[in-house]
């Protein structure tokens, strides 16, 4: 069984241009991966051991750049498709809350925090990390902080195919359970992105916590409005 968010009830007051641009950049980078192959992926994915080598004075500055480039890369079509669906559903509301430029900065900060969280777990790992999941987890954390009672429509595979309807759940339930799963799997010894099918659980945890905390700090007015509603 697989769950995908397909819609949020949170009203969107203006087009989420930055979010669409980020989605476009992810698609562009994925096309480059297909065209240029493994050499491009290995050069621009984030490998913790390469960053450790840079800190030790034996590596290239490119290792620092990969902290950013890796968050726009993906391992497969299903990987990028799933990530972009989550980003589309949750990113629009967060961009509307923050504004386009602050949202872009917020997204990048969450992505960096996610990669560094994974790095701290195993700084000598030679497994390349790639994917927008950590940055998107930050967007999800912000959504939980700002709109916990908003309703999320979930497509449940294969149930929704037979019932022809989605399941509606409050954001706090869906996002809270999602985070609990990441913590549980991360705590079961998942110390590398290459473990358990290539999922960087600690990147998800780091990104989510960063996004949640930043949203609570930057947008206290949103929380006051929610409390008064």
What positions do the PLM features span?
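A detector for small-residue-rich transmembrane helices and their helix-helix packing motifs
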Residues: 1-229
């Amino acid at each position: 069984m697989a769950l995908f968010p397909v819609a949020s009830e949170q009203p969107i007051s203006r087009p989420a241009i930055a979010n669409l641009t980020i989605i476009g950049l992810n698609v562009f980078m994925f096309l480059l991966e297909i065209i240029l192959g493994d050499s491009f992926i290995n050069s621009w994915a984030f490998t913790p051991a390469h960053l450790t080598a840079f800190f030790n004075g034996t590596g290239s500055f490119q290792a620092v750049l990969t902290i950013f480039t890796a968050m726009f890369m993906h391992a497969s079509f299903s990987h990028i498709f799933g990530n972009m669906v989550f980003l589309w559903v949750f990113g629009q509301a967060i961009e509307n809350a923050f504004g386009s430029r602050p949202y872009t900065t917020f997204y990048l900060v969450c992505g960096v925090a996610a990669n560094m969280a994974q790095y701290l777990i195993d700084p000598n790992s030679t497994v390349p990390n790639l994917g927008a999941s950590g940055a998107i987890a930050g967007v999800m954390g912000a959504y939980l902080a700002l709109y916990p009672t908003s309703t999320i429509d979930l497509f449940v595979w294969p149930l929704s195919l037979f019932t022809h309807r989605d399941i509606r759940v409050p954001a706090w339930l869906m996002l809270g359970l999602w985070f609990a799963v990441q913590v549980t799997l991360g705590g079961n010894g998942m110390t590398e992105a290459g473990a358990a099918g290539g999922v960087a659980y600690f990147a998800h945890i780091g990104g989510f916590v960063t996004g949640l905390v930043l949203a609570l700090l930057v947008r206290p007015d949103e929380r006051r409005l929610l409390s008064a509603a």
